[in-house]
């Protein structure tokens, strides 16, 4: 009897099946113990086995595979020592994956080490789940990897969804951060207006369109008979009269019923609350952006080793696009120019007496310009009031649009004058920009408030006119009833007269001062947009074409002399954007469509102005870096928001709404819709509690507490900022002391070595 112990050598038939089973098991080959199996004892004298039938052979093959599978499972049992060693190796490789880009190695070595670490983790991470009690750990590791990948992909998705990011990066690389800050501000304003539009469209315009009474059902929703012939003309629609006036675009179209539609939607309440909500949201988002910028600004001075940081840390090694690399190169170059200009400006010696005289002269000219523009606005307002009393058919296009055109032209030419005056002052470019913005802001704010005062006079005239219209409507109704009764008296006894009916287009109506206010703001917005675009086409595009194609045959160099290419007017564009947004906040309560019109304006402005900057403008001769916190723009926006909402709140609280148009018709004041809702839709005890909470004494106390809290938080923030500055100074001083101590120790060691020799 010969016994043969055979070391396992997989045969062809067994090799394929065993490898298929092993591939399904994620394990590390090097950590799996070697295994040997002793086959059955083979006796050479035994007779050859009889041939098996098909069923017996299949049963034996199935049993063999079951034994192989069970053996593979037993083989996966790893002892505790090997398991701990594998965990340590996996943690080490994961740490290497996370920190390999920070290693001071060549790129080839980084890539090679990263590939090896990822391969090791992917091959051996599943081995931790083999054995009793380890599968839950493997599942957690797998889910952690999938969650990290999901977060990374989601961040990439959010970055890809940021609108106009590549356009703004290209502009920043060519023109610097100061010009790019305007487009970033424009994009932020686009997002704010998108939220305002969603609120007004979904809660005001859409419910009225779906559930309100259709056009022609009420006098407020019908074009008067005298205007029907010209209601659809382009000139009338461009002036937002005719069909545009009697639509959901303006305040007067909305019905004053408490509920509309099968959902019993409370439209007057929604209209009032959405108007207040838009104002509150605007304040909240501006203040939040300002606080975020303050947080991003850091705690103090951060200019230590400024040029060293720019030299060694500016390049992004993950860039793989040649165009992106060119933009990044230009951006780094522009950043160096900005930093060098900042450094030189801090070392320039100035003639203080000459500079003071020139600055006084510049401010004198600025005050003259502001006074002249104010007088011109006042004169235009007086003329517009005179034109309002005349027949509109006798007026020309300029006479109808004189007020809007004067304001647009002043906003276009006065910033250029202020820019010329700023050349006399010789401020640092960033400080000069702030002075220029402040002057243009004062100009536009004065123009806006003169416009509001003119509107207030017109509103008072409309309110007086309403009283006469009410009396006339009463007489008209009495005459109509009298005529109807007379027509019935002429009929025989058994004859029924026709029902009394008057078409809504024939009913007399009031002037509806709210719609008039909304129309004025919409017209001013549209005229401002058209003026801006025409200015870009004529002042930038045609000028650039003339300089580009006529420079070869001209007497002097047009590119470096007069007229040359234009520079991008940061101050004028920023103030125009802020001024326009102030008009949106002021007029959106009386024209719910105004945020949507402004979205179209901002959307087209982004593409149009980006094209104009890249094709028609040149970088500024005086390069400067924009502030890291954009709070100067936001501060002016917050001020214009406050000044814009004051007239609106005054109109809501003090002026009576029109009697025959708008959702608040029939009430003495617009805010009475809140009391009406409390009376009809809330329990009496809740209405009583809300009235007590609205007590002026309690409101004043809450406001005082809020003011004191804000003061305390502001003082705390200033103290923390001062503490951060002190800590930075101490750290710098400690670094200098350590440096001097190391130098002394090195000198002492050198002296000792020299003495020993």
From Swiss-Prot:
<protein>
    <recommendedName>
        <fullName>Transmembrane channel-like protein 1</fullName>
    </recommendedName>
</protein>
<keyword id="KW-0813">Transport</keyword>
<dbReference type="Pfam" id="PF07810">
    <property type="entry name" value="TMC"/>
</dbReference>
<feature type="transmembrane region" description="Helical">
    <location>
        <begin position="570"/>
        <end position="590"/>
    </location>
</feature>
<dbReference type="GO" id="GO:0005245">
    <property type="term" value="F:voltage-gated calcium channel activity"/>
</dbReference>
<feature type="transmembrane region" description="Helical">
    <location>
        <begin position="594"/>
        <end position="616"/>
    </location>
</feature>
<feature type="region of interest" description="Required for interaction with CIB2">
    <location>
        <begin position="298"/>
        <end position="352"/>
    </location>
</feature>
<feature type="modified residue" description="Phosphoserine">
    <location>
        <position position="122"/>
    </location>
</feature>
<feature type="compositionally biased region" description="Acidic residues">
    <location>
        <begin position="8"/>
        <end position="23"/>
    </location>
</feature>
<comment type="subunit">
    <text>Forms the MET channel composed of TMC dimer (TMC1 or TMC2), TMIE, TOMT, CIB (CIB2 or CIB3), LHFPL5 and PCDH15. Interacts with PIEZO1 and PIEZO2; the interaction may be part of the MET complex. The interaction of TMC1 and TMC2 with TOMT is required for the transportation of TMC1/2 into the stereocilia of hair cells. Interacts (via N-terminus) with both isoforms CD1 and CD3 of PCDH15. Can form a heterodimer with TMC2, TMC5 or TMC7.</text>
</comment>
<dbReference type="GO" id="GO:0060005">
    <property type="term" value="P:vestibular reflex"/>
</dbReference>
<dbReference type="GO" id="GO:0032420">
    <property type="term" value="C:stereocilium"/>
</dbReference>
<feature type="topological domain" description="Extracellular">
    <location>
        <begin position="385"/>
        <end position="396"/>
    </location>
</feature>
<feature type="region of interest" description="Disordered">
    <location>
        <begin position="1"/>
        <end position="74"/>
    </location>
</feature>
<feature type="modified residue" description="Phosphoserine">
    <location>
        <position position="30"/>
    </location>
</feature>
<dbReference type="GO" id="GO:0070588">
    <property type="term" value="P:calcium ion transmembrane transport"/>
</dbReference>
<dbReference type="GO" id="GO:0008381">
    <property type="term" value="F:mechanosensitive monoatomic ion channel activity"/>
</dbReference>
<keyword id="KW-0209">Deafness</keyword>
<keyword id="KW-0812">Transmembrane</keyword>
<feature type="topological domain" description="Cytoplasmic">
    <location>
        <begin position="1"/>
        <end position="176"/>
    </location>
</feature>
<feature type="topological domain" description="Cytoplasmic">
    <location>
        <begin position="425"/>
        <end position="428"/>
    </location>
</feature>
<feature type="modified residue" description="Phosphothreonine">
    <location>
        <position position="38"/>
    </location>
</feature>
<feature type="region of interest" description="Required for interaction with CIB2">
    <location>
        <begin position="81"/>
        <end position="130"/>
    </location>
</feature>
<dbReference type="GO" id="GO:0060117">
    <property type="term" value="P:auditory receptor cell development"/>
</dbReference>
<feature type="transmembrane region" description="Helical">
    <location>
        <begin position="698"/>
        <end position="731"/>
    </location>
</feature>
<feature type="topological domain" description="Extracellular">
    <location>
        <begin position="655"/>
        <end position="697"/>
    </location>
</feature>
<feature type="compositionally biased region" description="Acidic residues">
    <location>
        <begin position="43"/>
        <end position="54"/>
    </location>
</feature>
<keyword id="KW-1003">Cell membrane</keyword>
<feature type="topological domain" description="Cytoplasmic">
    <location>
        <begin position="732"/>
        <end position="757"/>
    </location>
</feature>
<feature type="transmembrane region" description="Helical">
    <location>
        <begin position="177"/>
        <end position="214"/>
    </location>
</feature>
<dbReference type="GO" id="GO:0005262">
    <property type="term" value="F:calcium channel activity"/>
</dbReference>
<dbReference type="GO" id="GO:0009897">
    <property type="term" value="C:external side of plasma membrane"/>
</dbReference>
<keyword id="KW-0407">Ion channel</keyword>
<keyword id="KW-0472">Membrane</keyword>
<dbReference type="GO" id="GO:0032426">
    <property type="term" value="C:stereocilium tip"/>
</dbReference>
<feature type="topological domain" description="Cytoplasmic">
    <location>
        <begin position="298"/>
        <end position="353"/>
    </location>
</feature>
<feature type="transmembrane region" description="Helical">
    <location>
        <begin position="631"/>
        <end position="654"/>
    </location>
</feature>
<feature type="transmembrane region" description="Helical">
    <location>
        <begin position="513"/>
        <end position="550"/>
    </location>
</feature>
<dbReference type="GO" id="GO:1903169">
    <property type="term" value="P:regulation of calcium ion transmembrane transport"/>
</dbReference>
<feature type="modified residue" description="Phosphoserine">
    <location>
        <position position="308"/>
    </location>
</feature>
<keyword id="KW-0406">Ion transport</keyword>
<dbReference type="InterPro" id="IPR038900">
    <property type="entry name" value="TMC"/>
</dbReference>
């Amino acid at each position: 009897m010969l016994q043969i112990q055979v070391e396992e050598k997989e045969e062809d038939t067994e090799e394929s099946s065993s490898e298929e089973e092993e591939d399904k098991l994620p394990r590390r080959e090097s950590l799996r113990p070697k295994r040997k199996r002793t086959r059955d004892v083979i006796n050479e004298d035994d007779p050859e086995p009889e041939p098996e039938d098909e069923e017996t052979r299949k049963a034996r093959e199935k049993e063999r595979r079951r034994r192989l599978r069970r053996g593979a499972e037993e083989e996966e049992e790893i002892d505790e020592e090997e398991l701990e060693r594998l965990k340590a190796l996996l943690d080490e490789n994961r740490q290497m994956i996370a920190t390999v880009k920070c290693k001071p190695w060549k790129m080839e070595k980084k890539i090679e080490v990263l590939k090896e670490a990822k391969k090791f983790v992917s091959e051996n991470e599943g081995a931790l789940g083999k054995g009793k009690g380890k599968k839950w750990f493997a599942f957690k590791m797998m889910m952690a990897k999938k969650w990290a990948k999901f977060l990374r992909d989601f961040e990439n998705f959010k970055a890809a969804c940021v609108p106009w990011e590549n356009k703004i990066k290209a502009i920043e690389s060519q023109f610097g951060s100061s010009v790019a800050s305007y487009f970033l501000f424009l994009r932020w304003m686009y997002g704010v207006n998108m939220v305002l539009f969603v609120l007004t469209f979904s809660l005001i315009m859409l419910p009225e369109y779906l559930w309100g009474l259709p056009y022609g059902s009420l006098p407020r929703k019908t074009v008067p008979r005298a205007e029907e012939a010209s209601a659809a003309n382009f000139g009338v629609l461009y002036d937002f009269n005719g069909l545009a006036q009697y639509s959901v675009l303006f305040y007067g179209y909305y019905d004053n019923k408490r509920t509309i539609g099968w959902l019993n939607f409370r439209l007057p309440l929604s209209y009032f609350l959405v108007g207040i909500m838009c104002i509150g949201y605007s304040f909240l988002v501006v203040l939040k952006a300002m606080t975020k910028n303050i947080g991003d600004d850091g705690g103090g001075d951060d200019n230590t080793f400024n040029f060293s940081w720019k030299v060694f840390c500016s390049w992004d090694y993950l860039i793989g696009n040649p165009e992106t690399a060119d933009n990044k190169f230009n951006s780094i170059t522009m950043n160096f120019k900005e930093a060098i200009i900042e450094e030189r400006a801090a070392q320039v010696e100035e003639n203080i007496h000459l500079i003071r005289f020139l600055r006084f002269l510049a401010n004198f000219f600025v005050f003259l310009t502001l006074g002249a523009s104010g007088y011109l606005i006042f004169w235009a307002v007086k003329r517009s009031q005179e034109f309002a009393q005349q027949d509109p058919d006798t007026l020309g296009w300029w006479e109808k649009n004189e007020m809007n055109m004067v304001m647009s032209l002043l906003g276009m030419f006065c910033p250029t004058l202020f820019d010329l005056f700023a050349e006399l002052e010789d401020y640092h470019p960033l400080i000069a920009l702030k002075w220029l913005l402040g002057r243009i802001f004062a100009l536009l704010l004065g123009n806006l408030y003169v416009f509001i005062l003119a509107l207030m006079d017109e509103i008072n005239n409309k309110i007086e006119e309403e009283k006469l219209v009410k009396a006339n409507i009463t007489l008209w109704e009495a005459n109509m009833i009298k005529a109807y009764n007379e027509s019935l008296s002429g009929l025989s006894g058994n004859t029924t007269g026709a029902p009394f009916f008057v078409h809504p287009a024939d009913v007399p109506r009031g002037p509806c001062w709210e719609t008039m206010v909304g129309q004025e703001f919409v017209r001013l917005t549209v005229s401002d947009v058209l003026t801006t675009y025409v200015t870009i086409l004529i002042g930038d595009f045609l000028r650039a074409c003339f300089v580009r194609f006529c420079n070869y045959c001209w007497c002097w160099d047009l590119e470096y002399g007069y007229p040359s290419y234009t520079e991008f007017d940061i101050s004028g564009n920023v103030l125009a954007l802020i001024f326009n947004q102030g008009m949106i906040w002021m007029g959106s309560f009386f024209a719910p469509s105004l945020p949507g019109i402004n979205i179209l304006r901002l959307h087209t402005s982004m593409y149009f102005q980006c094209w104009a900057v890249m094709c028609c403008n040149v970088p500024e001769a005086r390069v400067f870096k924009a502030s890291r916190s954009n709070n100067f723009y936001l501060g002016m926006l917050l001020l214009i928001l406050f000044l814009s909402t004051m007239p609106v709140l005054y109109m809501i609280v003090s002026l009576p709404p029109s009697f025959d148009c708008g959702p608040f018709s029939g009430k003495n004041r617009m805010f009475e819709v809140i009391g009406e809702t409390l009376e009809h839709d809330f329990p009496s005890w809740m209405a009583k509690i809300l009235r007590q909470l609205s007590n002026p004494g309690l409101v004043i106390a809450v406001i005082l507490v809020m003011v004191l809290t804000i003061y305390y938080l502001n003082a705390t923030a200033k103290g923390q900022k001062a503490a951060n500055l002190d800590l930075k100074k101490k750290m710098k001083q400690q670094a200098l002391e350590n440096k001097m101590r190391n130098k002394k120790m090195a000198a002492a060691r050198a002296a000792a070595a020299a003495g020993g020799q």
